From Swiss-Prot:
Residues 1-26 are annotated as: Disordered. It comes from Pseudomonas fluorescens (strain SBW25). Keywords: Cytoplasm, Methyltransferase, rRNA processing, S-adenosyl-L-methionine, Transferase. Its EC number is 2.1.1.181. It catalyses: adenosine(1618) in 23S rRNA + S-adenosyl-L-methionine = N(6)-methyladenosine(1618) in 23S rRNA + S-adenosyl-L-homocysteine + H(+). Belongs to the methyltransferase superfamily. METTL16/RlmF family. One of its GO terms (cellular component) is cytoplasm. Gene3D superfamilies: Vaccinia Virus protein VP39. This is Ribosomal RNA large subunit methyltransferase F. InterPro entries: METTL16/RlmF (IPR010286), rRNA_lsu_MeTfrase_F (IPR016909), SAM-dependent_MTases_sf (IPR029063). NCBIfam families: PRK11727.1.
Amino acid sequence: MTAPSTPKPQRKKPKTATTAKPVVPRKEATLHPRNRHTGRYDFQALIKTTPELAQFVIINPYGKESIDFASPDAVRVFNRALLKSFYGIQHWDIPADYLCPPVPGRADYVHFLADLLASVNDGKIPRGSIVKVLDIGMGANCVYPLIGYMEYRWNFLGSEVDPIAVAAAKAIVQSNDLSKVIQLRQQTNPKQILLSLLEPGERFDLTMCNPPFHASMDEATKGSERKWRALGKADPKRKLPVLNFGGQSAELWCEGGEARFVTQLIAESAHFAHKVLWFSTLVSKASNLPAIETALKKAGVLESQVVEMSQGQKQSRFVAWTFQTKNEQQIWRQRWVRD
């Protein structure tokens, strides 16, 4: 994706606006307490719901049941079993070579976003179809909308530039009879993220995004090689097969990498300052945070924060920002109140 510069819309700050909070990572967090995936997996229970998983179960070097996470087929079937067992998703599959994200980490992002909404709603998580979420670049897997709906009954709009990914996600949504609560939309301009996508009158309580994190295909390939070698070190007997962690080019890299993509997203978000309560995006590289902080200030963001997450040995985080004052946030939350 080529990320052109985006003109900042002319907008006056409200008199009650406060200076944007600097983006400073919080202390490391553990798996979210509402995450269903704490502790070890009961593989025999998973096999009962998804029998095809049995062929991929192995005994790891520690004598425990696991799967070969270096096998795309094993990871895909494992994800299918998790989504079926924990979330009631009866039908889930993706085309070969498309990104197959780890479900626990994706669930963490959803739960922490729920906490973000609760923070402006007297600690109560708003639930149901009144909450609208935009998943930017949902991919073929459609995992965020599936988890978000099953956990909180939120309604989703998923956007994607790849027509094959849109078709795959549509098949998942339709086969699980979720078309009324999960809508899909193709972004026809690959050089834009929010612009040319949203329609007049649309409002969202949240946006979420798993951005491309590499700046080139070469960088993405080297990243895959590092993952393979890390897995090889965990099992000295492992032979390094053909690189294939899954992921199409639009999922893995874009011109300028993660920093360029996120800063463009921030710039474009200013055009929808009062159409969205909280914008957010994952940030895989902590080294990109200073550039992101600069972009937030330039865009006129009034409040921002970094939420650190931890899944096993992996550390991740997301950045969230809003253009709305505290008073405007309180007005916004009134739409969540049901009669």
